[in-house]
Structures are given as C-alpha cells and as structure tokens.
C-alpha cells in the first residue's frame, strides 16, 4: 500500500512489467495484494528451504580477522545446513516495446518514464553505463537537471541504471504539470539522443571522480566492503580489489 501512494513507483512497476513482458523479471519483488494473499505458510517454508540453503549462500567477511578462524567458525555454525540443489535459470530477455498511459484522477502532476536495455551487473560495460546515467540525470548538475528542473518545466527529473544478473535496464523519468507533459517528454528524449555526441572529457572526469570517491568511502566501512565483495562474488564468482575496481572506473 505504501508504494501505491507513490506515483513514480506505480509508473515504474507498470513500466517494468510492460518492458519485460512474460519474463520473470517483470514480477514485482514485493508482489501484489493478490499474490501475497494467496501465499500459504507451507509455500513460504518451501521457498525458504529451497533458496536459503548452503549451496545458494555467499558468506562475505571484511575487517581485522583471521581467515582460517572464520572458515572454522563457518563450518561449525553452518556446516550442517542442508543443500537444496536449487539453481538459477536464465531465461532470454526480449525487451518489449510498448507505449501506455495510466490515468490516476487523484494526481495533480503528470509523470513520464522511458526504459531501455542496458548492461548487466556482470558486464564490464556497466562502468560506462553508470557514468552515462550519472551525467544524464544522476546529480544536480546533470543534463536533465539543467534542461528540465532548472528551467522550471519539471519538479523532478532523473536517470538511473539498474544492473541485474546478466541484464539491466536504463530508466529516465520526469514529473511536471499535465499541460507541459508533451514538451517535457520531447526534451527528455532530446537529451538522451544527444548525450553521446555532446559528451566532453570534463563530463567523464567529474563522473569518474564521483564514483571513485563513493567506492573508496564505502570501503572504509566493513559493511560496505562486505556488500561489494558479496555482490561481486554472487554475480561473477570472482574477487576484485578496490584498486582494480577504481582502475575499471577510470
């Protein structure tokens, strides 16, 4: 219910469902009232037993530790966990082209969103994709900020890159007055179309600095380092140092 009160989230979920079509990625993570209501206690237990098993779990640790001791403790505490034989299947993604309009009479503003294919979380092109998304609509000095927000046409405008396992999507959106929707969408598309040809080395240097700083600061916390290592291992099955990560960003 909380998400249903957020106009952007309503549009986003409907857009993702349309974009991925019959693919499992079109399913809402939190489900719908209908799907949640139809889940039984036995269904939840079966799902937990299948997914939260020893052969489907990654243990990531960071900080001042003794690796051999960590392994011994993990074996002691978790060695008895059963395996379930669960495996991830990778259904081919075929992006769907669709144009739809939702009418919500309680809203005073109009919202527009565009979704397109982008690299996945295990694709090295994700670094370039992240930089492009940031330059286009990831900060106050972004292209969308100057074209739509600073001009007073939009209250909110941004671009995101959402990397997933072996696929990803790009999202650009804006909120505005209904009578300005056509103009805002036109400018939104124009900024996307002209991004590559208008890029400068200064744009890239600033974006690289933002990501490098964020990565470095995150590594100063054990929790941040664990999340990065765990996510990287889950997606690619490899270890990568912060230094290597920074080289890929630059």
What do these predicted ranges mean?
Residues 1-53, 64-250:
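Mature, solvent-exposed C-terminal subdomains and processed small-chain segments of exported/organellar
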């Amino acid at each position: 219910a909380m998400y249903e009160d957020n106009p952007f989230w309503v549009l986003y979920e409907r857009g993702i469902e349309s974009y991925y079509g019959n693919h499992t990625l079109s399913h809402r993570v939190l489900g719908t009232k209908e799907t949640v209501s139809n889940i039984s206690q036995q269904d939840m237990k079966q799902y937990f037993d299948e997914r939260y098993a020893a052969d489907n779990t990654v243990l990531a640790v960071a900080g001042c530790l003794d690796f051999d001791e960590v392994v011994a403790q993990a074996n002691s505490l978790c060695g008895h966990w059963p395996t379930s034989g669960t495996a991830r299947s990778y259904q081919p993604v075929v992006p769907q082209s669709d144009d739809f309009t939702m009418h919500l009479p309680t809203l005073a503003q109009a919202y527009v969103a565009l979704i397109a294919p982008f690299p996945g979380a295990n694709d090295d092109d994700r670094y370039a994709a992240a930089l492009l998304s940031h330059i286009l609509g990831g900060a106050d000095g972004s292209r969308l900020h100057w074209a739509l927000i600073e001009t007073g046409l939009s209250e909110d405008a941004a671009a995101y890159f959402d990397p997933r396992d072996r696929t990803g999507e790009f999202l650009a959106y804006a909120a505005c007055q209904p009578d300005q929707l056509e103009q805002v969408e036109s400018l939104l598309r124009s900024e996307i179309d002209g991004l590559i040809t208008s890029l400068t080395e200064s744009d890239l240097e600033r974006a690289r600095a933002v990501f490098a700083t964020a990565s470095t600061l995150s590594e100063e916390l054990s929790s941040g380092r664990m999340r990065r290592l765990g996510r990287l291992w889950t997606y690619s099955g490899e270890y990568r140092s912060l230094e290597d990560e920074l080289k890929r960003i630059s």
